[in-house]
């Protein structure tokens, strides 16, 4: 149960942070956001705000999306002769067009629609008491569709394709950007929770409770200067010295550890503990505990994580295998394991997954943010927009590829995790 809760929390935070990036910058760029969705498939919960944005929580944990005006099949069709009820504002502009038999306004004006333009001229024409009349439509007017769904109209100036190239570019990049920011923030938080960043340049150590060094009398912040005569000036020197000193170590044998404690030099016999095929003496690198050190430590962890992911991506390109990929099932399995190991493991996993999600979404494949950014760049270079039909076909092809890949990865994950 703890694993499921951890998975839901991690998944929810990653998706919300990612999609909020798209949502926020779309709004800032003047684009009308139709829907902010967490998950895919059937709706579990929905809410419409005053700005006309629908917020939905959906059943399948396969990502999320921000649907913007002008994307796909976004046009509202009103057939000639359709009965409608118009609600006017104080200026005489239509603020609501009701095509349903519900949500009726007693002050509304009945009309049989004969023509309309809700994108450019913002007008609606029809028969009112057998007389043809035309009314101006307010820029933020809403339409109540036949099924009772109320949505805002989308004039050309609030549609995605008519936003500035810079606005579209930052809107597409903002999702991955938010994931990078989240990853960095969580790594910094992790370093603060751990008390600092390991100082691998120092020979000062932290002593593990009930470990070999603790039993021999070493304490936190003691300075190991030699092991079996091998000089130690850093953590790397220490690990190498332990390996050399234990290379031919027999059962019950000890090694000599020379250390400095309170300015006094001491030498003790330490019996290393064997874990798998290696020996340890029960110490960890000391911590850099300054505020700046912790901030830089978090950034260092984020950079190291990104570098690891990029290397994995390179390996995927040179030698593709489904076993190198993971979907929601693999994410659940990792969340379950992290939950058993405590908060620090959960935060570390969340940070790595967030950076992973950011990098993955920047791959220039249609349907991913990277593919949209690539088309934005091509448009900027050509200085003319790509045809909507062309962009739609490219995106559809990308979606098809991603769906097939997701099904294959999920099936592979199920077989690997549960069987």
Swiss-Prot record:
It is an enzyme of class 3 (hydrolase). Zn(2+) binds at residues 18, 22. This is Putative zinc metalloprotease SpyM3_1689. Residues 175-274 form the PDZ domain. PROSITE patterns: ZINC_PROTEASE. The lineage of its organism: Bacteria, Bacillati, Bacillota, Bacilli, Lactobacillales. One of its GO terms (biological process) is proteolysis. It is found in: Cell membrane.
């Amino acid at each position: 149960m703890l694993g499921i809760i951890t998975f839901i929390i991690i998944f929810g935070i990653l998706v919300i942070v990612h999609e909020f990036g798209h949502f926020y910058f779309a709004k800032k760029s003047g684009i009308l956001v139709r829907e902010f969705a967490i998950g895919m498939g059937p709706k579990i919960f929905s809410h419409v705000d005053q700005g006309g944005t629908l917020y939905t929580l959906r059943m399948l944990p396969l990502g999320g999306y921000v649907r913007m005006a002008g994307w796909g099949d976004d046009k509202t069709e009103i057939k000639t002769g359709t009965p409608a009820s118009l609600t006017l504002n104080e200026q005489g502009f239509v603020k609501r067009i009701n095509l349903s038999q519900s949500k009726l306004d007693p002050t509304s004006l009945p009309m049989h629609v004969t023509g309309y333009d809700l994108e450019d001229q913002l007008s609606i024409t029809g028969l009112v008491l057998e007389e043809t009349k035309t009314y101006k439509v307010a820029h933020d007017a809403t339409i109540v569709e036949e099924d009772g769904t109320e949505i805002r109209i989308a004039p050309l100036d609030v549609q995605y394709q008519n936003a500035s190239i810079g606005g579209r570019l930052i809107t597409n990049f903002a999702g991955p950007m938010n994931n990078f920011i989240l990853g960095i923030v969580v790594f910094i938080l992790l370093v603060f929770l751990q008390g600092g960043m390991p100082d691998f340049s120092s020979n000062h150590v932290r002593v593990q409770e009930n470990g070999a060094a603790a039993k021999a009398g070493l304490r936190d912040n003691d300075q190991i200067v030699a092991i079996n005569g091998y000089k130690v000036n850093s953590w790397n020197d220490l690990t190498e010295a332990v390996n050399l000193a234990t290379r031919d170590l027999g059962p019950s044998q000890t090694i000599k550890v020379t250390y400095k404690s309170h300015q006094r030099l001491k030498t003790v016999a330490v019996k290393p503990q064997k874990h798998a095929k290696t020996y340890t003496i029960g110490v960890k690198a000391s911590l850099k505990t300054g505020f700046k050190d912790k901030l830089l430590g978090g950034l260092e962890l984020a950079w190291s994580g990104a570098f690891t992911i990029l290397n994995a991506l390179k390996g995927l390109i040179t030698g593709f295998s489904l076993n190198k990929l993971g979907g929601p099932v693999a994410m659940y399995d990792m969340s379950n394991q992290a939950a058993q190991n405590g908060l620090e493991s959960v935060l570390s996993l969340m940070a790595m997954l967030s950076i992973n999600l950011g990098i993955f979404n920047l791959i220039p494949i249609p349907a991913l943010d990277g593919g949209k950014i690539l088309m934005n760049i091509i448009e900027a270079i050509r200085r003319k927009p790509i045809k909507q039909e062309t962009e739609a076909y490219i995106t559809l092809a990308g979606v098809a590829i991603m769906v097939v890949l997701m099904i294959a990865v999920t099936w592979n994950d199920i077989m690997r995790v549960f069987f």
